[in-house]
Amino acid sequence: MASQRFVIALHSFPGKSSDELPLVEGRKYLLIKMDEEFGDGWWEGEDEQGNRGIFPASHVELISDERSDSSDSRRGKEDFSISTAEVTRSSLSSSRSTSSRSDKDSEKLYSNNSLSSSHSSILNGPLDSLSKPSVPSNFNSMFPSSKQEGPSPLLDNQPSSDLSNFNTIDADYNNASASTSAPATSASLKKVLSAEDSVRETITDIETALQNMSTSASRTPNDSSPLPYIENRPASSLAVSEKIQNVPNWSTEEVVEWLMNAGLGSVAPNFAENEITGEILLGLDSNVLKELNITSFGKRFEVLRKIQQLKDSYEQSLYEEYPQFAEPISVSQSSDSSSSIPKKSNDEAGGSPSKSSPTRPGFNDYVNRPTSVMPSLSNMIVSPDLDSSPSTDWNQYVIPPLATPSSRNSKSTQSAVPENVSRFDSNEPSATSPILKRSSPTDSISQNSGLPSRLTEPISSPSTSSIDVDKEGTSFPGLPYHSSKGNLYAPQPSSNVPTKFTGGASESSSVPPRPIPSAMKGKAPASAISIEALEELDPPKITTIDGESPSSISSRLPSSNLEQGSSSSVTKSPESMPDPSAKASSPVTSKGVSINEKSAVNNYATPLSKPQPKDTKGSKLGNTFVAPSPAASLPASPPVGTELKTRPTLRSVASSPLNKEPIGKRKSKRDIFGRQKVLPTGISEGLSNIPAKEAIKTADCHGWMRKRSDRYGVWKSRYFVLKGTRLSYYHSLNDASEKGLIDMTSHRVTKTDDIVLSGGKTAIKLIPPAPGAAKAAVMFTPPKVHYFTCENNEELHRWSSAFLKATVERDMSVPVLTTSRMPTISLSKAKELRTRPPSLLIDDENEANLTSSIGLKKNAKQKNKKSSKQK
């Protein structure tokens, strides 16, 4: 029977409904269920009469258990899917089976002694002695790890205080077992048996804890080994662990088997019907379980709880199998691996060689496995911490090139990682710690050597492989971005090209520092870097002005581009390298850079640019930029008119101060073909350069008014000139050109007294025609609503009348367009006929054929009129 928990009512609670249990203050109630499932603060309990119901948890207090059964409670906590007790028992049994016969005999002797000692301690000793955990003196012989050569790792890791506690427990246990007891009665024997069970359970718990501690201690005997030792793990434990690690690859049958073992056999057919695999199982949620026809909320909650336990065990098994997989993994190089990077000998480094770490055949497959938990090896930056030991020779380290996984790049790159990389366990930096800390600007220069403690560019020889980029063009964190598609201006320098570089601390580079290998001493100058490092640097940008020679352009280059090598290092071809003897005689500019070096800066060409014809009189140079190329160098003072090739970039084009478009004008689409035809807008075309004093001579109406601005609603005073439907305004009478224009064609003129708009004054509101209206005409200004106010009512009346006349009056020079199809005649001809319009359609020949009475009456009247005129 499981443990029973009781509560005492702190406050009285009257049950308001049938499912609520009334509480009386001070009484004790049996607790059946807490709110683990719902979390609403309502518990379920039972009173002394057997009535069940729910009650608020805030009204009761949980008291100690009256009756407990440790075996049942422990059995209820274990999980069917991941039986940790089974793993522990199997590992314990296998470890005991490997022990010698003497160990087995000692275990039997220990069990007999424990039984007799428990009897004696219960009969003669106090009951509180049962709570003390009893550990035998020969407990070291129970574990195979203690039989290894040298001291036990468990005892080595334990402090002296813990060992003294074990000795005290051992002494108490021996004292208790030494005493003898008299024959007990049947009642006392029952108590002895129950107490004996509790003692055995306590000893079992201690053995399990010690076994787990010894297993974890023996798992990593060597700090330099990246993989855990698993030789001491039994076969059954390995099988369970491997099955848990293979959860994403479970089939539907394995998922159903797991459900049956987990006590969820009622929903197993639903999973089998929908073909739920292990990968889908790890991603299930409550909504998906509803789709699987699991209608009960309690059943869905239980399934989700089991799945969460499976996820936790899956992650725990991965950590136990590969405890350092989330950290930089150091793989020792094999003896047959070829590498062009030399290593420093052990005598030179002053340390002992690191032990080779054990490897498993399937570990590489596990690393390449597509999982979200396993990080990519290419994203791990492994580098010794140079700040931890300032006096250490910084040339002893060798930094190999990083490489992408083989699954992402078809090219297999030889990769090497330092062997002395430790784990991230310690917070304190060590000599082998791979943690790279950000150094302050004051720490950028070493105190002893005066050299920069961290260089800003990775160092590699031309024979080593450079940094790879995948097909999508993405690079690794901390490295300069380099696109593999669409990069039409990629530099292609030849190999083994010496490079001019002046060492210095960088200020803008985000690449992790890499020290220079000691093997490169003597082969190249101290300031030489490889061409792979320069390929990732952007070239310096140069902006030229009309009539400026390239030599003067070079003088305006920032000295940091050539002296620091941070973001614009210069690569020279063998032909362009200045002679060391002639270096002293070359002129030096104010920036400290010689003309020969500056001429080499201009020694670049774009592969896709067209050659431009030379102009002896001088050419017009626009915004030009430099791109590296293995072309020949220019002379020290190149002739005027040499057109520099361009390498356009978004950053350089955006920062160009030249070739700005004029305000109010837009370019045609045909400009991309080189026609350079500028099309003016309607406003810029309509504005005229007539002075205000000249415009008022031919104006229909002119004067000062206040116009409300469109953006902020501010009333600004302007001088307006109206001529026809063209309303222009000036800022003052001294303006030489119009400042604004309003086309009043087909506008409506109204008056408004809005307090918000005009502050209580009467304002003239000029409304444009609605889109699609019959009176809508072509206007050269945007159709906006305009508001005007005047100083007095007379001016307001004068301007409103002028606006009405301009909008109503029709231009007689423009023909009137109509949609009517009725034939019309001129006004002069209509006056001559003096007849009604219908008579124009009647011919003399058709007068006799008219049969209509109305037509006969009209004809008779016309005849009478003609006869009367003749008389």
From Swiss-Prot:
UniProt entry tagged with the keyword Phosphoprotein: yes
Chain positions found as Phosphoserine? S224, S225, S241, S433, S439, S440, S444, S549
Ranges for region Disordered: 42-168, 329-371, 384-670
Phosphotyrosine-modified residues are Y229
Bias (Basic and acidic residues) occurs at 62-80
SAM domain segment(s)? 250-313
Give me the Gene Ontology terms describing cellular component: cell cortex of cell tip; cell division site; cell tip; cytosol; early endosome; medial cortex; membrane; recycling endosome
Q: Which InterPro entries match?
A: Boi1/Boi2-like (IPR045188), PH-like_dom_sf (IPR011993), PH_domain (IPR001849), SAM (IPR001660), SAM/pointed_sf (IPR013761), SH3-like_dom_sf (IPR036028), SH3_domain (IPR001452)
Major site of localization recorded for this protein: cytoplasm
Q: Is Transit peptide one of the keywords UniProt gives this record?
A: no
According to the UniProt entry, which residue ranges have a biased composition of type Polar residues? 131-168, 384-395, 404-451, 492-511, 561-574, 583-606
Lineage top rank: taxon: Eukaryota
**Which cell locations does it reside in?**
Cytoplasm; Membrane
- The entry's protein name is Protein pob1
Lineage, highest ranks first = Eukaryota, Fungi, Dikarya, Ascomycota, Taphrinomycotina
Query: Quick one: which gene encodes this?
Result: pob1
